[in-house]
Amino acid sequence: MTDLQNFVTNGFVLKKGLFSNKEIDKLNQYIAIRQDKEESARETTTSTGKLTMTMWNHPSEDLFGKFSTNERIVKPMEIFLNDEVYHYHSKIIWKNPGDGGFDWHQDYGYWYHNACLYPDMASCFIMLDKANKENGCLKVLRGSHRVGRISHARSDTPEQTADNERIRELEKRHESVYIEAEPGDALFFHANLLHSSDAVSYTHLTLPTNREV
């Protein structure tokens, strides 16, 4: 099955080694010295605990912009979406020991309310270190993008969550896949693909970076 067939059928494609260890090390070092990104980060809470993230819309000429507009991301996105693409926003998520994860949601569940009329959008999630079940890696419901947009709502947390009753039914029909990956791997996934992550269950520090194009 080709990457395009995987994207259409399953809603996601994991590209191994999209960026080299040297490139990821450089990006990690750059994040560590960018005080403005750390200062603009906000703490949020979900049903499983807290986590920290920062987000921005305009790709700059710095290293962040070079990653998010890199042809290794742009060209596959153009194939998957069958159109020219533009940068919508970038995000860094810090998950420290004991931090929580995200509840089941669709990215388009948020973007629909930002005047994005069609779900012709996708995300690219770049691993900045090893991602596994213990440190709260991303998990997806295979093929769930085909159900279309699901209603999202806030309960007692700041983050939106997809309708729980519908999620329970979809979990009976769609395989839950943990995206265990290495630094430099990148997950491309459709804006309607349901995804979540668990809380960090041990003391390893994880810095997954979510690049949404």
Predicted region positions:
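Non-heme Fe(II)-dependent double-stranded beta-helix
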Residues: 2-10, 15-116, 153
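Short, structured patches in soluble enzyme cores that scaffold and shape functional sites
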Residues: 106-108, 126-130, 142
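A structural signal for short, well-ordered beta-strand segments
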Residues: 89-92, 124-126, 205
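Conserved small/polar residues in nucleotide/adenosyl-binding loops
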Residues: 203-209
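Short beta-strand His + acidic residue motifs that chelate non-heme Fe in jelly-roll/DSBH
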Residues: 195-201
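Short, conserved beta-strand element in jelly-roll/cupin
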Residues: 117-132
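Double-stranded beta-helix
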Residues: 133-194
